[in-house]
Amino acid sequence: MKPVFSVDQIRRAENTLFELQADPDELMISAASAVADVALAMVDGPAPAVSSEESILLLVGPGGNGGDALYAGAFLAEEGHHVDALLLGNGKVHQSALAYYESLGGQIISDFPPHYLYRLVIDGLFGIGGRGGLTPELASLVESFSASGIPILAIDVPSGVHADSGELPPGVMVTVEGFDNDAPMARQKIPAHIDADVTITFGGLRRAHAVSPACGEVLCADINIAGGGGKSLSAELSQVQAEDATPQMFASKAYQRKDSLFERANLKATAPHIHRIGQHFTVLNMEPGPDHDKYSGGIVGIVAGSGTYPGAAVLSVKAAVRATSAMVRYVGPALNFVIQSLPEVVATQSLATAGRVQAWVHGPGRGLEAEQSAELAELLSRPEPVLIDADSLSLLQLSAELRQALRERKAPTVLTPHKGEFERIAAELRSEGVEIPQADKDPIGAAQALAKEFDCCVLLKGKYTVIAAHDFVHAINAGHSWLATPGSGDVLSGLVGAHLAQSYAELNRLPEFFPDVTLSDSAIYTQIAPAATIHAVAAGLAARTEFGFAPTSASLIADAIPAATAKVDLKRIV
């Protein structure tokens, strides 16, 4: 797990170090050294089939990012690699970095080269201050590398990717070589950004690293200067964040594949100062305590399913059963299906007869009628945590009264929309004058805005899941895309609901030991990220076979929750 910072915070921390540098390029050289270490690890791996040479190409922009690339290229040339630099700054270049690069044998080229000459491409074009996309000509060159499997290492942020939001520029139309001009596929739309295989950044993560697949595998190296007692960028960033008193942001990666650069090149051994994004949570242990029973461990109540969608109830309840040793209650018309599949569940048809519950889940496959709306209104009036998913999110979209009830609610609430559900709710709020960013352009800002509007926690689902509350943001890269299967959201709701119930039960025991402690909603919300991580790990395990990965299903994901729970690093805090 790594902290995430805005561009403004990065700039302010860097400026402090710039003022203390003994040499104008001291910090840049420190960054370039890390770039070179990663580049060496990448070229030591298997060579692309189309690459006939061992050369390295630098794409060099006019600013500091280009300077990083040139200094890194100099270090690589010093190691004996042939390095070419394509200067793309319209006559502007970091002069001292260029001079050092050339002094160590680095070459300058002026024409766009054929892709097969290179073993690795280093993107030093835009950096975190860049705006806009690549030109059609440059986009075509980059596409030729990507299409041929030649790896690209981006410095700081892949060029074209907005560092604060992860937003991508519109694609560009190009004429592809090898086709007649009037051929149907001669003109194609290609990305106007760089899709990196690896991104190396410094001091801490940028927001784009937390949400953009264009960054590829993200690695982070701390950089420092000799002056000021050896100050580091990470320390300055922590100071800036403390001064801002803004919500803390973190990013993590759930499922670590064995074929990653970090594993393949043994980068941890060769460059221990460079780190990947990991898990590392401090969370509640799911093992019952010695004084627990089926009630005290946290009972989750799941209100889901209908005559049309009984399977949604089964999947959500199954996930909860697999995630907790405590009792799971079911409320809804699909109780026969649920009990047949999961006889340990206590089922009823009505909230009035549900019994004691520590957290509620409402919505999966439940329906959009007046009965379901009344159920949701009833749950919003109760003190227990409520997770709102699927059909219940649509009920919020359709009912101004329910939205107002949510605003007035004083108990913990979690919304779990995918981007389509998010946008439907956001459209209603925008019509009321509320500013909500688009989820596909700025997922962090969008989730934060919705969480602020309803004073709740928002879990915006996707391969990159964003969890936002009033005082923190946590983005989780699943590490794969196997969650894109019907019913996986129902599984997530039951899994998170079980964690909420246990968290609510455990945290309410704290006053026994710490009578002066006042509990906040955030203490419960922080347990959502481990649940989402377990969900992603379970999908990875469910998709894994002895021969490799293959399509999986929501049922198999639910079955893999116990193994995923054991795999994720958990620590008891109570």
Curated annotation (Swiss-Prot):
<feature type="domain" description="YjeF N-terminal">
    <location>
        <begin position="10"/>
        <end position="231"/>
    </location>
</feature>
<feature type="binding site">
    <location>
        <position position="65"/>
    </location>
    <ligand>
        <name>K(+)</name>
    </ligand>
</feature>
<dbReference type="GO" id="GO:0046496">
    <property type="term" value="P:nicotinamide nucleotide metabolic process"/>
</dbReference>
<dbReference type="GO" id="GO:0052856">
    <property type="term" value="F:NAD(P)HX epimerase activity"/>
</dbReference>
<feature type="binding site">
    <location>
        <begin position="480"/>
        <end position="489"/>
    </location>
    <ligand>
        <name>ADP</name>
    </ligand>
</feature>
<keyword id="KW-0630">Potassium</keyword>
<comment type="function">
    <text>Bifunctional enzyme that catalyzes the epimerization of the S- and R-forms of NAD(P)HX and the dehydration of the S-form of NAD(P)HX at the expense of ADP, which is converted to AMP. This allows the repair of both epimers of NAD(P)HX, a damaged form of NAD(P)H that is a result of enzymatic or heat-dependent hydration.</text>
</comment>
<dbReference type="GO" id="GO:0110051">
    <property type="term" value="P:metabolite repair"/>
</dbReference>
<keyword id="KW-0547">Nucleotide-binding</keyword>
<feature type="binding site">
    <location>
        <position position="123"/>
    </location>
    <ligand>
        <name>K(+)</name>
    </ligand>
</feature>
<keyword id="KW-0067">ATP-binding</keyword>
<feature type="binding site">
    <location>
        <position position="490"/>
    </location>
    <ligand>
        <name>(6S)-NADPHX 2</name>
    </ligand>
</feature>
<protein>
    <recommendedName>
        <fullName>Bifunctional NAD(P)H-hydrate repair enzyme Nnr</fullName>
        <ecNumber>4.2.1.136</ecNumber>
        <ecNumber>5.1.99.6</ecNumber>
    </recommendedName>
</protein>
<dbReference type="InterPro" id="IPR036652">
    <property type="entry name" value="YjeF_N_dom_sf"/>
</dbReference>
<dbReference type="GO" id="GO:0005524">
    <property type="term" value="F:ATP binding"/>
</dbReference>
<dbReference type="GO" id="GO:0046872">
    <property type="term" value="F:metal ion binding"/>
</dbReference>
<feature type="region of interest" description="NADPHX 1; for epimerase activity">
    <location>
        <begin position="64"/>
        <end position="68"/>
    </location>
</feature>
<dbReference type="InterPro" id="IPR030677">
    <property type="entry name" value="Nnr"/>
</dbReference>
<feature type="region of interest" description="NADPHX 2; for dehydratase activity">
    <location>
        <begin position="418"/>
        <end position="424"/>
    </location>
</feature>
<dbReference type="GO" id="GO:0052855">
    <property type="term" value="F:ADP-dependent NAD(P)H-hydrate dehydratase activity"/>
</dbReference>
<dbReference type="Pfam" id="PF01256">
    <property type="entry name" value="Carb_kinase"/>
</dbReference>
<feature type="binding site">
    <location>
        <position position="365"/>
    </location>
    <ligand>
        <name>(6S)-NADPHX 2</name>
    </ligand>
</feature>
<feature type="region of interest" description="NADPHX 1; for epimerase activity">
    <location>
        <begin position="127"/>
        <end position="133"/>
    </location>
</feature>
<feature type="binding site">
    <location>
        <position position="156"/>
    </location>
    <ligand>
        <name>(6S)-NADPHX 1</name>
    </ligand>
</feature>
<feature type="binding site">
    <location>
        <position position="159"/>
    </location>
    <ligand>
        <name>K(+)</name>
    </ligand>
</feature>
<comment type="similarity">
    <text>In the N-terminal section; belongs to the NnrE/AIBP family.</text>
</comment>
<dbReference type="InterPro" id="IPR004443">
    <property type="entry name" value="YjeF_N_dom"/>
</dbReference>
<feature type="binding site">
    <location>
        <begin position="461"/>
        <end position="465"/>
    </location>
    <ligand>
        <name>ADP</name>
    </ligand>
</feature>
<dbReference type="InterPro" id="IPR000631">
    <property type="entry name" value="CARKD"/>
</dbReference>
<keyword id="KW-0479">Metal-binding</keyword>
<keyword id="KW-0520">NAD</keyword>
<feature type="region of interest" description="NAD(P)H-hydrate epimerase">
    <location>
        <begin position="1"/>
        <end position="269"/>
    </location>
</feature>
<dbReference type="Pfam" id="PF03853">
    <property type="entry name" value="YjeF_N"/>
</dbReference>
<keyword id="KW-0456">Lyase</keyword>
<feature type="region of interest" description="ADP-dependent (S)-NAD(P)H-hydrate dehydratase">
    <location>
        <begin position="277"/>
        <end position="574"/>
    </location>
</feature>
<keyword id="KW-0521">NADP</keyword>
<keyword id="KW-0511">Multifunctional enzyme</keyword>
<dbReference type="InterPro" id="IPR029056">
    <property type="entry name" value="Ribokinase-like"/>
</dbReference>
<feature type="domain" description="YjeF C-terminal">
    <location>
        <begin position="277"/>
        <end position="568"/>
    </location>
</feature>
<comment type="similarity">
    <text>In the C-terminal section; belongs to the NnrD/CARKD family.</text>
</comment>
<keyword id="KW-0413">Isomerase</keyword>
